Amino acid sequence: ALQQGDIDMVWAYSTGVAGTYQDVLSTDTNVSLVNVAAANAPAVLAFNNAKGLFSDENLRQAVSYALNYEEFKTYFGSAYAEIPNRGFVPSTTVGYTDTEKLTTDTAKADEYMKAAGYTEKNADGFYVNADGAAAAFTLTVNAAKETHVGYAEMIKTQLEAFGIQV
């Protein structure tokens, strides 16, 4: 509708224009895009730190380094997408303290798994501890948000390829 002149403006306050549309709209000479740094966290992977698998910080760090952020950027971002920094607070927040970019480093993720006591992999390719229990967890997602379901599917695929059962 925007490209055909049926509407004059798209305003999606909390989400902006989806990355897949940004790439198309950016080449249209009749459309102007205004890009503003995000002041929110559109997707967050939150852990239960109090009990279970992720009560061990080493496992949370392993997940962080096992994920392929370039793949997330490619599939869910746009030409304007950037891999965020570590931490929960967006850089546009007043008082923000700079942190390093999220990076993929499966060797470092493997070191964190070993530090948590998951030193071997079973026949299915999942890390196991000394008791033979696999590193496994349940990922819960709001199914009403299609993009979040896509994030969850990619997280599952990437972590299971690394050796954590989801």
What are these regions (language model features)?
Residues 2, 8, 139, 157-166:
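Periplasmic binding protein-like
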Residues 55-157:
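Append "and occasionally in soluble cytosolic enzymes with long acidic Gly/Pro-rich linkers
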Residues 51, 92-93, 163:
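Short amphipathic alpha-helical interaction patches enriched in hydrophobic/aromatic residues
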Residues 43-45, 135, 164:
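Structural beta-strand/beta-sheet cores of well-ordered domains, especially the beta-sheet scaffolds
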Residues 1-51, 62, 74:
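Extracellular/periplasmic solute-recognition and catalytic clefts
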Residues 7, 29-31, 81, 118, ...:
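Short aromatic/hydrophobic-glycine micro-motifs
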Residues 21, 25, 149-162:
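Short, polar/charged alpha-helical segment
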